[in-house]
Amino acid sequence: MTRSTRLYADDAEMYRLFETELFVAVVGDVMDTLGLRHQFLPPVFKPVDEKTRLLGRAMPVLEADIFPSDEATRNPLMTKPFGLMFEALDDLKPGEIYVASGASPRYALWGELMSTRAKILGARGALVDGFARDTDGIKALGFPCFCTGYYARDQGVRGKVIDYRCALEIGGVRIEPGTLLFGDKEGVLVIPRQAKQEVVRLALEKVRGEKLVAKAIREGMSAVDAYRTFGIM
């Protein structure tokens, strides 16, 4: 795509297009047509607040379970509370999404204070492959958080962050630092960097075409004729 035909100049313009015109279902549809048929995260991921959507670039965070004992450890990270969690949180950049995975579902990976810090740093949300807690506080902040459920149990003595800004896989979908994520209450998509421009272009064409289809159906056109005419349904 040449510079003159680009749909947006930067992330801010791209986010505006997503926020004003696009939704997950239509983006998923066009990704299917491009052969990107395995980019949805598992359907267990839901927003803490259904009014919020997830949109930004991934900052992956690797979690691991721990099982404390009285024996000496050979790993200095084991003596550090929460491992590298605070460093990972403080390293968030504007426009990024904190994406945590690797832990078993025994404790919460995200909460209100983490949301507060992330919001101050300009992050656009959190996606944790596990539980969130302090959900009323997260809702009050208006901070987008997607998780697999709610559980108040703390990770302090049960898990640690062992790395960040590293590639992850969630549900068989690879997420690298900087990968674009788009989510709403109907699902979360991982949009590969090399396909992003084409995905946005086709999604805009489809969503604008769907408005024409809806108008035709309201005016009496049958579903068969609508699909034959527009190729959209």
Regions found by a protein language model. Give the residues of each.
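Intrinsically disordered, low-complexity regions enriched in acidic/Ser/Thr/Pro/Gln residues
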Residues: 1-88, 209, 215-221
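Structural motif
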Residues: 28, 38-39, 57-60, 96-99, ...
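Short, ordered loop/turn segments at secondary-structure junctions
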Residues: 66, 103, 130-133, 150-151, ...
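A general structural motif
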Residues: 78-83, 107, 162, 166-167
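Extracellular/luminal Protease-associated
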Residues: 87-115, 119-129
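Ligand/cofactor pocket segment of small-molecule handling proteins
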Residues: 120, 124-152
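Acidic, glycine-rich flexible loop/linker segments
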Residues: 150-226
